[in-house]
Amino acid sequence: MPANLSSALETFKQQRDAAEAHYLKTNRVSVFFREYTAAVETLLAALWVEHFQNSALCLMAVGGFGRGELYPCSDVDLAVVSPAPLSDGIQEQIARFVQTLWDCKLMPSVKSGGIDELCESVRNDITGDTAFLEARFLFGNRQTADELAEKMNAQRNVAAFIEAKLVEMEHRHAKSQGSGAVLEPNIKSCPGGLRDIHTLLWIAKAQGLATNLPALVKQGILTRTEAGMLSHGYRRLAHIRIHLHLNAKRAEDRLLFDLQPQVAESMGYQGLNLRRQSEELMRVFYRAIKTVKQLSGILTPMLQSRVSSTPLRVTLRIDDDYIQVNNQIAARHTDIFFRRPEHIFKIVEIMQQRNDITALEPQTLRAWWGATRKINRSFYQNSENRHRFAGFFRNGNGLTQTLRFLNLYGVLGRYLPAWEKIVGLLQHDLFHIYPVDDHILTVVRNVRRLALDMHSHELPYASALMQSFERQDILYLAAFFHDIAKGRGGDHAIQGIADARQFAADHFLTEEESDLLAWLVENHLLMSTVAQKEDIQDPSVLDAFCKRVQTHERLSALYLLTISDIRGTNPKLWNAWRASLLESLFHAAGRYLAGNGGNPHALFGRRQQEAADLLTRAAVPEKQQKKLWNALGSAYFARHQSREILWHAANLVHDFETPIVRSRILPQSDSFQVMVFMPNGPRLFARLCRIFSRHGFDILAARAFITEHDYILDTFIVQIPSQHAPEDYPDIQSALEAELNSFIHGHTVAEISSHSRRISRRSRYMPIAPSITITPEEDYPDWYSVEITAVNRPFLLADMAEIFFAHNVSLRYAKISTLDERAEDSFTVFSPDLKNPKIQSSLKQALLEQLA
């Protein structure tokens, strides 16, 4: 590289480093862009002189560089333009110029060609046309640059351009769905991200309007408030993106888990642990994109309407204050929301009641939103407003859209201060994927879908139950309040009771309705906890659950709320196995509450009699049956449900000395039930778990039982890896049975290290602290309940079983609750040694070391 270029490159590096250092001191986004852009232009000037001095070509900044928005690791978008088609010699010159840019590590993105060629290239290329919309002359022949801009502007169909940009935005938003996009969002392309702000300004510029916010205020396009909010949202997002590039040292626009703590710390979120820093950063991010979405929803249709051909307007009178324009509602006088604030809710009420109205007319929306910022205590205390707000839930129609609309524009947070505290609050607990406010509204949506015939095919039984439930509005409110106390510290279910009762008192609910609402908020985790963590075959578990529930109405409401909550937490959590757990508990509790629970001994006897009846119908002699029951022992009927007993008995009654393996595909699910019967021996349970994990199965539940003649009868429910289609299940079943049969007959089976499979990036960088509790069972001496919470990973259950074995603890039952990347496992174990506090402490320490 020539000496003059080496000097220019060194100057550039110094200016770039100075710009970054200055930014880290001041956090002024606009100053960084100006200084960094100037540094790049200084280097480009030297390179241009070296390659194209006295040329008819010109160099233009396009795209992000053109608008002066250059991030630390962004591409430098350029265009080399010629008044005439490029000759071979000029093309070679341009190639050398581009290579020099790469040598300088500028990451160039360069378009080149003659004026006509470039105009033709972007005619049907919306991305290229957009890049040149922001073209800015740098060096060379200015006349060439002016001619290119003139021709491109002349050929651009503004209405078609705007339509294409809006379609592009829809597609971009559609790609930003799913858990990954929520947890590790792309700050540039997500809904409400930087690209949405750019789109708004492109639509304005294509119409010949200004592209800076103060000028748009002067032109009457934006109000000062709107410009201020949009500017604030933009600065927040740009601030995060600059820090993201600086920490990643690459053009990374996703807020990846491993980068979130680094970005948060460099932005000044100090004095907090890494998880809290990340949560605070993400909350700032979600609030910023919410502001952008608010303004985009108002300004985009307004800007579009300036140039789009107006369709036939169908105007209908609604009442003295409102008219319907096509599918939108418009206020006759937009100052009505300031003069009569009760209309803030009234217009929403009308929109909810009318299926033919889907939106507020843009000018009406703008005025309505401006008035919502006046919502205060006086507005809340107005009984008309309270009646209308409660009416949104009583009506039910369009409830989800109504609440999401009110949340998007900040009305829920202004009306209910408790709601404002959860807006954008993300939980790094390895299974929630939505901010708390989005999660709550998704749960409301799920409850509402159960009430609609059109969605009955999704969950037929739950839908029928919901559609016969008398007080659906209380269920909607329970969904709305169930997590409203998140983020305050302490038990959010208990803290939420006060919010729910205050709302009920203020919004004219009866005492009975208030009691049901408060009970559901307090106990919204009860059913999922019992179903997923406890052994509902144990009569004492069912008895304790029903004492909490007390009535069939509460049971039905809790069942419906629990289903909706799990489905609204993370799409990965809802599966046929969880559905069956909840349904089993629901029906068992229903029978109990109806007086059919019976005493435990009668229940166990009934289970044995059902199995005996089955064997008698199969012509099994009574003498043979008694031999089987004696081998299994009386405790067997206390620890297994009827369906398992019937299955075991049919397979064991003729021979309960020979080891066997049996499996069956559970109906309407992606799971197998597997039974293993063989002589007892060391580490058998752990080794069986390793076989399942080696095949990629998730163990959902496991029951370890030792017969009177010292055989193990272990029963597992395992989930088939998601990449397999149902038609593959029989082959998978055969392969699994073959390996298990080899194992029970003494053949060596290869064991794989617990750490041979990696855990996810989220689990690595946002781990949860493992916790362990060991509690003695009240009615069973030497029996203990062990509760473990940890990051989920392959071989977790096998490793726990190994530690139990090493500490002379006999594992008898395991209930595995896998919540995406979080494991909440419950074990029932037998060990007289655990009476000794030192041994119990040693066990706990060993488990913690394995989970760390």
UniProtKB/Swiss-Prot annotation:
Provide a Gene Ontology MF annotation, just one.
Answer: [protein-PII] uridylyltransferase activity
What is stated about the way this protein's activity is regulated? Uridylyltransferase (UTase) activity is inhibited by glutamine, while glutamine activates uridylyl-removing (UR) activity.
Q: Where is the HD domain?
A: 436-558
Q: Which PROSITE patterns match?
A: ACT, HD
Look up keyword Cell cycle and say if it applies. Answer: no
Reaction(s) catalysed by this chain, per the record, are: [protein-PII]-L-tyrosine + UTP = [protein-PII]-uridylyl-L-tyrosine + diphosphate; [protein-PII]-uridylyl-L-tyrosine + H2O = [protein-PII]-L-tyrosine + UMP + H(+)
For region Uridylyl-removing, the annotated ranges are 319-672
Tell me the keywords, alphabetical order: Hydrolase, Magnesium, Multifunctional enzyme, Nucleotidyltransferase, Repeat, Transferase
Keyword Calcium found: no
The record's region (Uridylyltransferase) falls at 1-318
Query: What positions does the domain ACT occupy?
Result: 673-757, 785-852
Query: Which family does the UniProt entry place this protein in?
Result: Belongs to the GlnD family.
Q: Report the protein's function.
A: Modifies, by uridylylation and deuridylylation, the PII regulatory proteins (GlnB and homologs), in response to the nitrogen status of the cell that GlnD senses through the glutamine level. Under low glutamine levels, catalyzes the conversion of the PII proteins and UTP to PII-UMP and PPi, while under higher glutamine levels, GlnD hydrolyzes PII-UMP to PII and UMP (deuridylylation). Thus, controls uridylylation state and activity of the PII proteins, and plays an important role in the regulation of nitrogen assimilation and metabolism.
Its recorded name reads: Bifunctional uridylyltransferase/uridylyl-removing enzyme
Q: Source species, please? A: Neisseria meningitidis serogroup C / serotype 2a (strain ATCC 700532 / DSM 15464 / FAM18)
Lineage runs: Bacteria, Pseudomonadati, Pseudomonadota, Betaproteobacteria, Neisseriales
The gene from which this protein is expressed is: glnD
